[in-house]
Amino acid sequence: MVTLMPYNYAAPRCGLIDKMIEPKVKRPKTDHTDTHERNRLCNLSQQQQQQQPQQQQTHQQQQQQQQQSHQQSHSSTVLASNGPSSAGAGMGVGVGGGGGSGGGVGGGVGQCSPLGLPPQSQPLQPTIGSLASLSGHYSNGNANPNVNSSSCSLATASSFAQSAGSSFSTYQQAGGTSGGVSGEDGVVGGATVMSHWTHDGTGSSAAVKSESRSPGQVHASLDNGSVAGSNLYGCSSASNPLDGGAVAVNSSAVAAAAAAVYDGKHDYYYYNSMQQYTPPPFYSGYGTPYAAATAARQAKMEPGAAAAAAAYLTPSYAASGNNNSQLYSSPYAGYNNFGQQDYGGYYNEQYGNYYSPANYSPYAVSSPSSSASHGHGFHVAASSNLSESPTDTHSTTPVHQTTHSPHSPLPISPSTGSGIGPLGNVSAAAAAAALNSSGGSSVGTAGSGGVATSKTTPTGKTGRARGRRHQQPSPTRSTASDTGNSEAVKPPERVFVWDLDETLIIFHTLLSGSYANRYTKDHSSLMTIAFRMEEMVFNMADTHFFFNEIEECDQVHIDDVSSDDNGQDLSAYNFATDGFHTNTPPGAPPNLCLPTGVRGGVDWMRKLAFRYRKIKDIYNSYRGNVGTLLGPGKREAWLQIRSEIEVATDNWATLALKCLSMISQRENCVNVLVTSTQLAPALAKVLLFGLGGIFNIENIYSAHKIGHETCYERIVTRFGRKSTYVVIGDGNEEETAAKAMNFPFWRISAHSDIRALYTALDMGFL
């Protein structure tokens, strides 16, 4: 039974509402930054508290009004929880709906609270009453005049939103447009979801002005006059601010579920507000720091404002223990981590950097489809790109928008029409297209007509991640082409590191006779073929690659001495008369090369660099036309030797070449050769065995001096740790080095191993 008492509707009810839901505990002492502003705004509320002693009756009257307003405005059920401050929490319900065929009525129950948030919670947050009123007032296409259902004036509500001591409240703006009519099952124009889901302003012509811009109202002018949704709580409403035709709404099932979440415990939350508005321990505010990055990407925030938003959200909202940002976030809110409510400050302060480094190993291929498991980073920082992994653009790796890792702080949206994370205010199709086209780093902005534009860097990073140092060692970074990960070139997804002898080609076992013994071949004939090929290899190395001059000063990579090259034109340079091999220190052996590589000073090193540059030019010029380099006479002999080797080895090189060709045809994979042979004869082998078209000379390394493991470290330094490395070889040395680097190893010991590798590549397992 409800007793209706006479009440003066001209007087504001701010004081009653505040006193009605006031916690019955000892209030902590809070220091406000501006006491005059608080006293000025809540002066009426203090007078009303002294004049109205009937608290319980007005309490029941207010509850009945809220229930009636909730039932009548079933088309736009927006029931918001109050601010997280346990010091002085007020209850406000903002109801804004596009009623009728063209009009939008913005109503709200204003609130005033003499108690505000603690000092660290002072940045502006809009209240329910003020923003519900302003949303109806500034709604585009509003056919009816603004109706303020609260007895507080619009000026009072709007000025209260500016106060430093205002309670934190979420809100819902439902801008009724000419196309938004009353739908079925409680769905009308405007996003009808829980207010915690949609922190989005739909007014496109004017925004709520404030002196200190909150993350929800950052730079409305940057989006052509539209207020881009900031998605402070990780979810978006998929509404389109500039779409003049219709307003995108979520499904009625989501709205019904959202209403049921609150309605089922309406009385419980209402009467026990002082316990419930300090969130229960099974809700987690774990993802609140990540909302700053989401807001920055959505509203195109500059780094200064982004840092302010991150600093605002993390200490004042998450670290203070007020982690009810996900109280009504989604039906899946119960699946969040447990027990972090009482230790919110401990988690955010002590373990704030736990997710900062990318401390997972991208090298271990645990399954054939392991590339998909690295599609989303498991441990990422708040300002880093969530989708920075190179597998996002692979054609065979699908990108699922709603798929997150088990430890991902981003909630899973229950509706396919709602955006994920930074891709708010964009339709699902446009979000997927932007994600796939820009490598997962697109920033969805609300353009005219809802067209999503992407903002990305060539490496797939966001603008704020530009220029950061890579968290990787650089053991032997030496030259221009063998440098770290360049910002202008996206690193490959997979790097296949091949061994040369007995993996890609059969050569040493032919010379030793072990291949003939294993496969019961003619020992003498195979050795004869092998010796002929060996002679051709060393002739090419001596004639064209200066092997007789640089044998004792062999390098690991073709560009290791390029820093000593002054770029002199070598077209008319005479290498035979430059005195390179005669400038030897007194008393030194004839072909001594010191460990540092310095033999005859700067001039000698420059001449050595000239030779390696000439080797590089010859390789690049004749890699696809070796017969021209050999000459007509040697060309026929070379083709004959290759044909005989193919017959003797049962087309071993042909099978390996198929695997190499399949990898080289992929846009995001690269073949790298690491051989124990010296660099000059290794280049001759590559050309003579027909592999020059596959391997660029920059992708060939010699492990003759430094070993395979050091070569692998240099390769990782060059391509970066985000790539996946697969080592393919036949010996124990390659396998040991691969295990030391945590690289998967594919052993090649027979023809069946090459066929299995080809099948794995063809099926997309590698």
UniProtKB/Swiss-Prot annotation:
UniProt region (Disordered), positions on chain: 22-131, 200-223, 365-419, 437-489
Q: What is the effect of changing residue 734 to Q?
A: Highly reduced ectopic eye induction
Q: How is the cofactor bound?
A: Binds 1 Mg(2+) ion per subunit.
Q: Where in the cell is it found?
A: Nucleus
List positions binding Mg(2+). Answer: 499, 501, 730
Q: Which Pfam families match?
A: Hydrolase (PF00702)
Q: Where is the signal peptide?
A: none
Give the GO cellular component terms, alphabetically.
Answer: cytoplasm; cytosol; nucleus
One MF annotation (Gene Ontology) recorded for this entry: protein tyrosine phosphatase activity
Q: Where is the composition biased (Basic and acidic residues)?
A: 22-40
Swiss-Prot/TrEMBL cofactor(s):
Mg(2+)
- In this chain, composition skew of type Gly residues spans 89-110
Q: Which superkingdom?
A: Eukaryota
Which residues act catalytically here?
499 (nucleophile), 501 (proton donor)
Q: EC number(s) for this protein?
A: 3.1.3.48
Q: Which UniProt keywords apply?
A: Activator, Developmental protein, Hydrolase, Magnesium, Metal-binding, Nucleus, Protein phosphatase, Transcription, Transcription regulation
> What's this chain's function?
Tyrosine phosphatase thought to play a role in transcription regulation during organogenesis through its intrinsic protein phosphatase activity. The phosphatase activity was shown in vitro. Appears to function together with So and Dac in eye development. Required for the survival of eye progenitor cells at a critical stage in morphogenesis.
Q: What is this protein called?
A: Protein phosphatase eya
Organism, as annotated: Drosophila melanogaster
Taxonomy-wise, where does this protein's organism fall, top ranks first? Eukaryota, Metazoa, Ecdysozoa, Arthropoda, Hexapoda
- The gene it comes from is eya
